Regions:
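Conserved NTP/Mg2+-binding pocket subregion across the NTase superfamily
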Residues: 68-188
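Hydrophobic, Leu/Ile/Phe/Ala-enriched alpha-helical segments that form helix-helix packing faces
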Residues: 15-23, 74, 78-82, 269, ...
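Conserved nucleotidyltransferase catalytic core and NTase-mimicking acidic/glycine-rich helix/loop elements
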Residues: 132-303, 308-310
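Basic, alpha-helical terminal appendages of large translation-related enzymes
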Residues: 1-2, 66-72, 262
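Secondary-structure junction/capping motif
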Residues: 1-6, 105-106, 221, 237
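N-terminal regions immediately upstream of nucleotidyltransferase
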Residues: 1-17
């Protein structure tokens, strides 16, 4: 059983009745779910994931103005829930960084993930918050939220402004062009195979980020990036190709093939840019398309920032 399903079942079996019986006046002010750090929040957990920080548990997101006495009573009631469920024991010690389950103030949760308690109100906040943090703030599942405040903030983080999306996309495109379409071949010509591999890793990193932005999805922490990419609607088939590019050698025959693959990937990304009417450039150079994407930004302030300001 996956961690997300385990969490929901634990809540439905024990948590829901506990809250209804012991906190009836508070029940409709809480948001319940599993959101945040950990592979189980993304649905990526497996048997290996159970060797650390894995337990039956759920989050009780409470209003920021909850009184300390009620918060303490909630914490005690949650702690008294069964110590084992479906053959999985609850953790006796909180993981590094604090408990991922139990009673959490809504504002504290979002502040820890994004730097904001209630949602972003400036472009600067959007531009300086890593997509992996936004992924962790908006993953998982909300089982119940009668008040709707937790879900309102969650949705606000899911709705990245188009100008921000374009600025980040332009930055990743130009970085991908620099690393993959230019520096990789330069390094190979100089006999710098290590440098060539670093260039290819940079290309894959930025091109993958561009693919996530084209899908309007947040790219998660790097160790889950390939897993998440394979689930995307658009260009998900490139995941295996990127994996080959960063894991293969740079002997002459392979390096030549990799350079061709880079151009193929660029062509596929450009086609998607054109489908979404994000570029007017007519060429195979990702750098030129990056500037064309940047030209579509409506905010003069954001458009005139350095093209790499979003990466």
């Amino acid at each position: 059983m996956k961690g997300l399903e385990l969490s929901r079942k634990f809540y439905e079996t024990y948590g829901a009745s506990m809250l209804h019986e012991k906190f009836p006046e508070l029940e409709d002010k809480l948001a319940i779910g599993l959101v945040g750090d950990g592979s189980e929040c993304f649905g990526y957990d497996d048997d290996i994931s159970r060797d650390h920080d894995f337990e039956p548990g759920f989050c009780i997101f409470v209003p920021d103005d909850i009184d300390s006495r009620t918060e303490f009573q909630l914490e005690r009631a949650y702690a008294k829930l069964p110590k084992s469920f479906e053959g999985v024991d609850r953790l006796k010690i909180s993981p590094v960084g604090g408990s991922r389950h139990g009673v959490i103030k809504t504002g504290d949760f979002y502040l820890a993930k994004t730097g904001s308690r209630t949602g972003f109100d400036s472009i600067d906040q959007w531009m300086t918050t890593p997509d992996s943090c936004l992924a962790a703030a908006t993953n998982g599942e909300v089982f119940r939220d009668d008040l709707g405040e937790f879900s309102r903030i969650r949705q606000s983080f899911l709705d990245m402004p188009q100008d921000v999306r374009l600025k980040k996309l332009a930055g990743h495109l130009i970085m991908a062009a620099q690393a993959g379409q230019y520096n990789f071949k330069r390094c190979i010509s100089h006999g710098e195979t290590g440098g060539a591999q670093l260039a290819m890793i940079e290309f894959a990193d930025h091109a993958m980020s561009a693919v996530f932005l084209l899908n309007r999805k947040y790219r998660p922490f790097y160790k889950w990036a390939f897993r998440a990419m394979r689930e995307l609607e658009k260009l998900s088939g490139l995941a295996d190709t990127f994996e080959f590019l960063i894991s293969s050698d740079n002997e002459p025959v392979t390096a030549s093939a990799k350079a061709d693959i880079v151009e193929d990937i660029a062509s596929m990304i450009i086609t998607e840019l054109q489908k979404q009417s994000l570029t007017d450039a007519i060429c195979g150079d990702l750098e030129k398309h990056a500037y064309s994407v940047n030209d579509r930004i409506s905010s003069t302030q954001l458009r005139t920032m350095h093209i790499m300001a979003g990466v």
